[in-house]
Every structure is written in C-alpha cells, then in structure tokens.
Amino acid sequence: MTEADPIRVILVDDHAMLRKGLRFFLAGFDDLELVGEAASGKEAIRLCVELVPDVVLMDMVMPDMDGAAATQIIRQQTPTVEVIALTSFQEEDLIERALQAGAISYLLKNVSAETLAEAIRQAHAGHSTLAPEATEVLVKATRQRAGQHDYGLT
C-alpha cells in the first residue's frame, strides 16, 4: 500500500439503514474506501478472507453470530485486519468480550464522523481508540475488582 492508497473498510451491521448511513459517511473521506458490507458475522468472515480489508467496523450485537465471535475468527484467519467494535451498547461484559476477541477499538454508534474516521486511521496504524463511555466502564470495573483484593500493601 502506498501513501496515496485509501484505507480499505468493511462494514458489518445487521441493520441496513445503519450500513447506508455509514456508506454515506465513508464516501466523504478520500482516504477511506468502502470495499464490502455484511449483515452478519458469518458474512463478515467470508468477506474478510476474500477481500482482506484494512479495517472492519463491526456491530457487536447481531443474530446468528455476534460481533465478538466474528471478530475472533477474523483475527485468527486474517491477522492483518483490524476490527473496530461499533455498537450501541456499553456494558462491561460486551466491551471486555470485544477486546478479548481482538478488537483494537470500541466505539459507540453515537460517535461523530470525524472521530470515527480518525479511529479508522488509528486502527490502521495499530493504535486503539476507546469511547469515553467504554473507558469509564472499564476503569470502574477494574477499580471495583482491585478493591476486592487485599494486596497486603501499607
């Protein structure tokens, strides 16, 4: 890939209207190219193997196969592909499952276009982006777990 080549992106969401909106959003950035869309985790895996995109925008809650399961398989089969979890949910277990499955970033669907574009660029460069809400959930959970342990420190 040369400096002028756009970042190749696949959208994965079971809601056609959301994919349409993201398609429109991506068209506004010269450095981002939509190369495929999937409505399910299984379809996403097939597309990633076939097209080997740079970045996948992955919904986490879908019927049939959820985004975390699809992310794990995509990362195993195409390890150069970075996955951004893009969801409406900010529950601790979902955030942890997405990151443990191999997602490099976790964003909420209310993210601004500029923030999402920058997160795609950062993911392509190997850097993480977490929604502030996700960061807050993880910090609270970690602090709660730390408070449950007596480390014998004085």
Regions from the language model: what does each represent?
Residues 5-18, 22-26:
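Conserved acidic segment of CheY-like receiver
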Residues 31-39, 47:
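Short hydrophobic/Thr-rich beta-strand motif most characteristic of the beta2 strand and flanking loop
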Residues 46, 68-80:
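Short amphipathic alpha-helix used as the core "switch/output" element in two-component signaling
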Residues 59, 87:
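Active-site residues of response regulator receiver
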